[in-house]
Structure formats: C-alpha cells, structure tokens
Curated annotation (Swiss-Prot):
InterPro entries: cNMP-bd_dom, cNMP-bd_dom_sf, HTH_CRP, RmlC-like_jellyroll, Tscrpt_reg_HTH_Crp-type_CS, WH-like_DNA-bd_sf, WH_DNA-bd_sf. Residues 155-228 form the HTH crp-type domain. Keywords: Chloroplast, DNA-binding, Plastid, Transcription, Transcription regulation. PROSITE patterns: HTH_CRP_1, HTH_CRP_2. The keyword Plastid applies. It comes from Porphyra purpurea. SMART domains: cNMP, HTH_CRP. GO terms for molecular function: DNA binding; DNA-binding transcription factor activity. Pfam families: cNMP_binding (PF00027), HTH_Crp_2 (PF13545). This is Putative HTH-type transcriptional regulator ycf28. GO terms for cellular component: chloroplast. Residues 188-207 bind DNA.
Length: 237
C-alpha cells in the first residue's frame, strides 16, 4: 500500500475530458469556473493518496470521491477531523504550526479541483452572488464538521459505526433494488481509524449487522438494505 504525498508543485494525474464534461454539468463550482474561464487544475487521487497542507495551500473542491481530514502532530499521532464528499472543500484551514499540520487522504479514487485563493478573492469582488454562495458553502462545511464530531463522540462504538455508514450512504450512496450501496471500498481498519476504534471491534459489529440483515457486502462495498430501519436501531440504543 503506497502513499503518494502531493504538494503544490507536483504533476497531477489528468482527468479525461468526458469526465470533466460530465462533472461540469452537475457541479456548481466547476460550472461557474468554466463559465468565467477561471484558471484551475483538476486531478485524480488514488486510494491512500495524501495531500499535505502548508500556509500556501490552495482551495480544493471535491468533484467525486471521499476523503478524510487529519490533524497530524509532530510525534506522528493523527486525529481524524472530518469526512469529506462531493462538493465539499478543504484547504481553508491554515493553522499549521511547529507542533502539527493537516493532511487529507483519499479513501477511494477521487477527483479534485484546486484553485488559487487570489482567484477566489477576485471572483468574490466581481460577483456578489458567488460571495453569498461561498459563505453559505462554508456554513454548510461547519455544520457537517460538527455532525462528524457528534458521530465520533458517541460512547457506543456500534452507534458510531452505524452513524458513519448512514453518513456515507447519504453522500456516496447509489440506490439499488436491495437498498443503498455505499460506493466506496473501505477496509475495517480504516473504518476503525475514522471512529476511534479497532479492526477487531469493527469486524464484530459488521458481522452482527450482516447476520441481522441490516447490511450486506457486495464486492467489498456495504449495502444498507433499509437506512430508516438502521437509523431506528441506532436511535433505540
């Protein structure tokens, strides 16, 4: 398993024109930047690729995929702060110090847009509607980050895992006849890291959820058969 540490000067893997065209129709950021001919980059991340932030970091916007934000201390201890999905942004936290820094890691294949802050500021000055959009977006980011903190603050590891699966199904789910497929390949070890548990506990809980038919597995991806029923199980615990 290789980690690819990315920085501002690296050569990113290009995204195909067909994918760009598809994303431009459904992503408001990309659509606006293309309309205004604003300079930006689009690149792909493979599973476990990492972006490390410094004070010169750009604004990054997720077009597709799922990433986790980590606070990394100089003793290599890591704290997961949030799970990011399509249309979320990151890079606007610039509080790195000599004690810690921030990084994001791709949980699966992801497509990300990056743009200089100076360009964003120029757009805000010339397009008031974009400024309103940006403020609303940052408020939603704050709400989502708070939601994630609520998830990992549950005393019950089972509740944490169920809440995380429901969150992922909401943002990365694909509707099927037998339920919602979480379109991510995430190991039990990574799930454990996200919610502050261990692989053995996660394996035990998932096995129990499979046995009680709340979820099933399809090619290493989780299917939630009835999200409402699963959330009721969570609320009744």
């Amino acid at each position: 398993m290789n980690n690819h540490y990315l920085n501002q000067g690296c050569s990113f893997e290009k995204v195909s024109k067909n994918i760009l065209k598809k994303n431009s129709h459904c992503n408001p950021w990309l659509s606006f930047f293309n309309q205004q001919d604003s300079e930006h980059q689009i690149f792909s991340l493979k599973q476990n690729d990492i972006i490390i932030f410094d004070v010169n970091s750009k604004l990054y916007i997720i077009l597709a995929g799922c990433l986790i934000v980590k606070k990394v201390f100089r003793n290599r201890k890591k704290i997961i702060l949030n799970v990011l999905t399509s249309e979320d942004s990151f890079g606007h936290t610039q509080f790195a110090s000599n004690r810690f820094y921030y990084e994001v890691e791709a949980l699966d294949v992801a497509q990300v847009l990056s743009i200089e802050y100076s360009i964003i500021m120029n757009i805000c000055q010339n397009y008031p509607n974009f400024s309103v959009f940006l403020v609303n977006h940052l408020l939603l980011c704050s709400i989502k980050a708070n939601h994630f903190m609520e998830i990992i603050s549950h005393k019950s590891i089972t509740n944490r895992l169920i809440s995380l699966l429901l969150l992922l199904s909401e943002h990365n789910g694909i509707s099927q006849n037998n339920g919602i497929l979480i379109d991510l390949t995430i190991t039990h070890k990574v799930l454990a890291q996200i919610i502050g548990s261990n692989r053995v506990s996660i394996t035990r809980i998932i096995s129990k959820l499979i046995h009680t038919k709340f979820i099933s597995m399809q090619k290493k991806k989780v299917i939630i058969h009835d999200p409402i029923l699963l959330s009721q199980r969570f609320s009744n615990r």
